[in-house]
Amino acid sequence: MTFLFFGPVVGFSQDLCDFPADELGKKFPQAGMETMSSKYQEIRDSMPSMSDMTDKQMSLVMKSMGGDYYWPHSINEADNAPGLLILAHGFGEEGDADLYNSMEDFSEIYQTTIAYGMSMMSSRHIECSLLEMDQAGDGKTYIVPVSASPFNTLVRQWRYIFNLEDDYSYANVERVNSQRAVFLEPIGDHPLVREIVLDFANEISSDPSNEVVLIVAHGPVSGEDNALQLEMMENISSYLSANGRFLEVMPLTLQDDAPPEVRAANVQRMREFVSSRSYNGRDVLIVSNLMSGKGIQRRVERDLEGLTYTFNSNGVATHALFREWIKVSIQESLGKSQMD
């Protein structure tokens, strides 16, 4: 499902986007500290896990996440070239570069930019990337949320920025309106992500009849969202069972940003699954629908220390079929707009 927005890109001054790129072409909009500090209480109110933090602690957390930024590919000089704005959480320097490089071919057709960051306290990196696209062409801009599920605070914050949600997830950042923007749904349990996860399992499989597969996801904060994501992941699990002929397939969410006791309970379930199947002589394969191969995989390995399993740590977003999913989603949005 897609959404169109009408009206010019508004809500910020063009002067705020007048800053140089670094040597790689990354652009880091800067927001004043007075703006940042005013958001802390909103985040405390929105995020129970951060409710007791002081301003200083909050500042340290934000710095540890790294700044929001955007990274445009070379400008497509074709007249009326459409835009492609890819929104990603951010996966560290190496993971960000992997995603950026994997999307290079799109720049032959689209004005292509990846905007990295959680947009917790600012949307300026999104605003400025849209402004550049508006200046470079006048076709539609397709907004791609890089997320395994729509059921999480990050996707809702992005949707809030594009006026698709009434309430923010973190803080009240600037909202944008663009006559060009078409917001695509996250990949979720789309048939192509089922194929991607099956590929990951097959890459480490040798005897499916004696193998069990655990599909590990980052997971959302709330229990309600978690139930919805697990229901979605059951469709991926069923696909692997039917097409991979594995003995058993189970989805599991870590809820990595939830309160420690919630995550710990999920880790315990994960350890019990791996240890019990190994004890019964089964080979345990672990895959994920994580967007990046540079995400929480190391924490998963620490969580499973001392157990026997095989882990394919690859991420979905750099798989060739993820790019195919973007193409399919754009075509579906075009078909829908023609019917409307």
Q: Where are the predicted features?
A:
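Bacterial N-terminal signal peptides
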Residues: M1-P8
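Sec/Tat signal peptide C-region and signal peptidase I cleavage site
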Residues: V9-S13
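Active-site-proximal alpha-helix that buttresses catalytic centers in soluble enzyme cores
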Residues: Q14-D340
